[in-house]
């Protein structure tokens, strides 16, 4: 049975608060885990949600602000204590390696696994990861530092004729028939887009059109638009405008400012424009399929 879901480890913004943890999510695709951002303390929520650490091999960091990456060292430490031996891959801005590799070498003299950094260009969209079931693309955003979102695209599943091997078929006349001609589409692929942090930025619309779920930052209320513009963040209403323009199926708001004791009014602001909107919350598990 297919599984494609998002686990929310943290949905707060930069200022630590008791109500929210800092930004981090886990995409669970058929039991394989992929982390998006790793704010301070993400390893605590990871364990609290009973996620399997041996299933997490790939981490995607949107940008180098502390509330999105300071948890990396703590996560590596947890993996060491739990006896990890499998390599850990981190996909991020090119500066990530020079910032974190010296710390990893200093604190972990004999690391039992490799931390492999995969840099990407944050100024353009591109494919940065692919395996048998998933493709991950970058979505350039507009923030105070180079920032990207991520598009997680499940590969479509095909069913083959039981009498055919999984490969090309050769007829008696030595004509090769592509395996795609011997299969049929069993399910359409699902897509999840993560966009945080960014100002209102219409350039992302073509990259996220029609996604099954869009996570878009909603740091501020529309009454604080001046502050949002100053800090290169978005309001809940602006997130809903992006969702509507991109014709997404569902919108999830997050990256909430600590100034608001309750985000319900942010939800109402967004739902006036895009009704199928929800608020992210810690330890939420949201199926995409």
Curated annotation (Swiss-Prot):
Binds 2 Zn(2+) ions. Zn(2+) 1 binds at residues 63, 65, 143, 197. Gene3D superfamilies: Ribonuclease Z/Hydroxyacylglutathione hydrolase-like. Zn(2+) 2 binds at residues 67-68, 197, 255. Its EC number is 3.1.26.11. Its cofactor is Zn(2+). GO terms for molecular function: 3'-tRNA processing endoribonuclease activity; zinc ion binding. InterPro entries: Metallo-B-lactamas, RibonucZ/Hydroxyglut_hydro, RNase_Z/BN. It catalyses: Endonucleolytic cleavage of RNA, removing extra 3' nucleotides from tRNA precursor, generating 3' termini of tRNAs. A 3'-hydroxy group is left at the tRNA terminus and a 5'-phosphoryl group is left at the trailer molecule. The active site is at residue 67. Keywords: Endonuclease, Hydrolase, Metal-binding, Nuclease, tRNA processing, Zinc. Homodimer. Zinc phosphodiesterase, which displays some tRNA 3'-processing endonuclease activity. Probably involved in tRNA maturation, by removing a 3'-trailer from precursor tRNA. Belongs to the RNase Z family. This is Ribonuclease Z. It comes from Azobacteroides pseudotrichonymphae genomovar. CFP2. The gene is rnz.
């Amino acid at each position: 049975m297919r599984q494609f879901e998002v686990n929310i480890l943290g949905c707060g913004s930069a200022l630590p608060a008791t109500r929210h943890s800092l930004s981090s999510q886990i995409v669970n695709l058929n039991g394989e885990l992929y982390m998006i951002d790793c704010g301070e303390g993400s390893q605590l929520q990871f364990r609290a949600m009973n996620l399997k650490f041996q299933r997490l091999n790939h981490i995607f960091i949107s940008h180098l602000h502390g509330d999105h990456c300071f948890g990396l060292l703590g996560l590596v430490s947890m993996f060491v204590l739990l006896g990890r031996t499998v390599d850990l891959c981190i996909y991020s801005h090119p500066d990530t390696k020079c910032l974190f590799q010296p710390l990893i070498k200093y604190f972990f003299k004999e690391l039992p696994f490799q931390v492999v950094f995969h840099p990407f260009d944050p100024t353009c969209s591109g494919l940065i990861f692919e395996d048998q079931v998933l493709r991950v693309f970058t979505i350039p955003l507009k923030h105070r530092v180079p920032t990207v979102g991520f598009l997680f695209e499940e590969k479509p599943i095909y069913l083959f004729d039981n009498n055919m091997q999984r490969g090309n078929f050769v007829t008696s006349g030595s004509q090769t028939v592509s395996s795609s001609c011997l299969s049929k589409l069993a399910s359409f692929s699902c897509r999840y887009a993560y966009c945080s942090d960014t100002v209102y930025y219409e350039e992302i619309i073509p990259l996220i059109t029609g996604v099954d779920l869009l996570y878009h930052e909603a740091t501020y209320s529309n009454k604080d638009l001046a502050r949002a513009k100053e800090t290169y963040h978005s309001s809940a209403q602006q997130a809903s405008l992006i969702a509507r323009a991109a014709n997404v199926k569902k919108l999830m708001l997050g990256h909430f400012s600590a100034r608001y004791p309750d985000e319900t009014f942010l939800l109402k602001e967004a739902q006036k424009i895009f009704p199928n909107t929800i608020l992210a919350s810690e330890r939420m598990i949201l199926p995409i399929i």
